[in-house]
């Protein structure tokens, strides 16, 4: 947007000191926290998104009797989790795609990590862009974390 200027942005307001210049292409960020998916929040969110697929609402539509959690809800949870590690990100400029690789059910705990794919400088003062790959998962982390990263001494790693 015209007039965008983050030159004097105060990182103490977000509680995280890292800005665009601190991230490196290829870096993987563990977003640390997890969220256990609840039936009620899934049902409400799925209705708000106007997804009417019966597998999300009617337990009799699956042989195991479980409602399948709507992938859009999992994506939203992952995006929320990504604020831990990307707290100074100010806007999403685009979503380039998504895949639902595995099922999610009520009671599953979702975690997330991101990989920095690319960086771009912009003409706006104090503003840069990161191209990220955000991955939601349940279970153990799917990559080895650098637990001794001097840039992030206060991060807890799962």
Which stretches of residues belong to each language-model region?
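HotDog/MaoC-like acyl-thioester-processing domains
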Residues: 1-8, 106, 113-158
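Solvent-exposed loop and beta-edge segments used for protein-protein assembly and interaction
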Residues: 25-26, 69, 106, 126
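Intrinsically disordered, low-complexity boundary segments flanking structured domains
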Residues: 17-18, 23, 80, 143-151
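Generic structural hydrophobic/aromatic packing signal, biased to beta-strands
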Residues: 20, 31-34, 45, 78, ...
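A generic structural signal for short, non-catalytic loop/turn and secondary-structure boundary residues
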Residues: 24, 88, 154-156
């Amino acid at each position: 947007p015209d007039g965008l200027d983050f030159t004097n942005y105060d990182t103490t307001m977000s509680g995280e000191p890292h800005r665009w210049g601190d991230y490196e292409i290829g870096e993987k960020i563990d977003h640390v926290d997890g969220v256990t998916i609840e039936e009620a929040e899934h049902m409400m969110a799925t209705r708000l998104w106007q997804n009417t697929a019966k597998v999300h609402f009617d337990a009799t539509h699956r042989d195991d009797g479980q409602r399948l959690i709507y992938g859009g809800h999992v994506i939203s949870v992952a995006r929320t989790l990504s604020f831990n590690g990307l707290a100074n990100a100010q806007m999403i400029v685009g979503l380039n795609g998504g895949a639902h690789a595995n099922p999610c059910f009520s009671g599953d705990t979702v975690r997330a990590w991101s990989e920095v794919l690319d960086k771009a400088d912009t003409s706006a003062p104090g503003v840069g862009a990161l191209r990220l790959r955000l991955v939601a998962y349940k279970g153990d982390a799917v990559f080895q974390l650098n637990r001794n990263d001097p840039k992030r001494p206060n991060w807890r790693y799962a």
